Each structure stands twice: as C-alpha cells, then as structure tokens.
Amino acid sequence: ALGYEAHARGSVRDIIARHAAANGVPFKLADAVVRIESRYNPRVSNGGALGLMQIKPATARGVGFAGSASALYNAETNVTFGMRYLAQAYRMSGGDVCGTVMRYQSGHYANHMNAANRAYCSKARAIMASN
C-alpha cells in the first residue's frame, strides 16, 4: 500500500509542478497547499470543495471551468483550475505566503487574517521548509 501511495503522490506532484510553473506559483507553495487541502487524495470532498485543491465548482467556474462538479475529482482538471485560483491569490498578495493562503482559503478579497488563516499559513511554511 505504501508503494502505491508514494507513486500516486509522485504523479500528483508532477501535475502540481507543471501547473505551478505555468501559472507562476512557486512549486513549494503549490505543493504545500495541495498537501494541506487533500493530502494528495483526489477523491476528497469537504463542505462542497472537491479534489486535490479542494476547489468549489463555483470558484472553478470563476477561473474558466465549464464542466460538471464531478470532473473536479480528476487530478489534472482540479489542479488546472485550482492553480489558476491560487495564482491569482499569489499575485494579489505580492508573493507573500500568508497573504496567498489567506486569500486561497477565505476568498480573494479577504484582507484580515483569522485564526484559521494563521494556522494554514503556519502549516504551509512548515511544509515548505521541509520540502
């Protein structure tokens, strides 16, 4: 089982790397977001957020997605649109890690860190430092 998990994580990280580069997001930041959101499991769903990057269908539609919600369980599709949203948050935050994850988690127009955002930022920084 461990071998499969490592293989799945490796192929997911290849997808993350490709889309992070295409969207101008540092790989370590993109990888940390996926790890926090789904632990690399493309089948995760929580509160209407789906897949690897836990993106809601309405949010995905806002960055060009036109498929059915279930299509967001596909790793490639999910990361395509999740990374577009993350890249916008990254640009709006001037590349600041905490600002990026705050906007990714709470919406692009969030401008005050809440406790959940602070915890997310701490996790992201720890993951980025260990990668």
Segments and roles (model prediction):
Residues 1-15, 21, 62, 66-73, ...:
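Non-catalytic cell-wall polysaccharide-engagement segments
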Residues 11, 25-30, 47-50:
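Extracytoplasmic
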Residues 25-41, 79-83, 100-106:
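Short, functionally critical alpha-helical segments immediately adjacent to catalytic or ligand/cofactor-binding
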Residues 27, 49, 54, 69, ...:
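Glycine-rich phosphate-binding loop at the start of an alpha helix
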Residues 28, 54-58, 95, 99:
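Generic alpha-helical secondary structure signal
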Residues 34, 56-59, 128:
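Short, small-residue-rich loop/turn micro-motifs
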Residues 43-45, 113:
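Short glycine-biased active-site loop of nucleotidyltransferases that positions the nucleotide triphosphate
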Residues 48-66, 82:
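Substrate-binding/active-site groove segments that recognize
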